[in-house]
Amino acid sequence: CKAVKANAGFGIPTVKPWDAGTIAEKMALVRATGAFAVAMDIDAAGLPFLKNLNPPAGSKTVEELRGIIADAKVPFIIKGVMTARGAQKAVEAGASAIVISNHGGRVLDQVPATAEVLPEIAEAVNGRCKILVDGGIRTGVDVFKALALGADAVLIARPFVNAIYGAGAQGVQVYVDKL
């Protein structure tokens, strides 16, 4: 949240699926940043300690999500959707967008690739919210394929991290030019 606030709300803070009280605290922090949207992971994948909290963090019901989304007061993005049923529940809860994500394939390596589930999810959503997708997007061709399969936009992280660590701003520019 500090980085988003320091950049006049440019950025989308992402919260974990904590208990209701912690989420309310996090939403207050998000509102203070001036962020134009907020995201929440729909699961605690890769963070097993979250499930050991009392009360445990993790999956939320449609009703719980409705309350969280209403409290956010900015467009709300649900990340980690991997099924048509999950996408329909996100829409029912009032999400502005979903992110089809298997958390980079390194945390949930037993689940399908995002490109495999994207067409079915796009059909289920049927334009009722924006569909973002991540996971394995590395080239302009990958971006094109994701858009052709039903995504409204793609998210790319690891290649940008590698580019900035390898060559700073110039590395990022080279990567963008190659896209």
Regions found by a protein language model. Give the residues of each.
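Internal helix-turn-beta structural module
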Residues: 152, 166-179
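Alpha/beta enzyme core
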Residues: 7, 18-133, 140-164
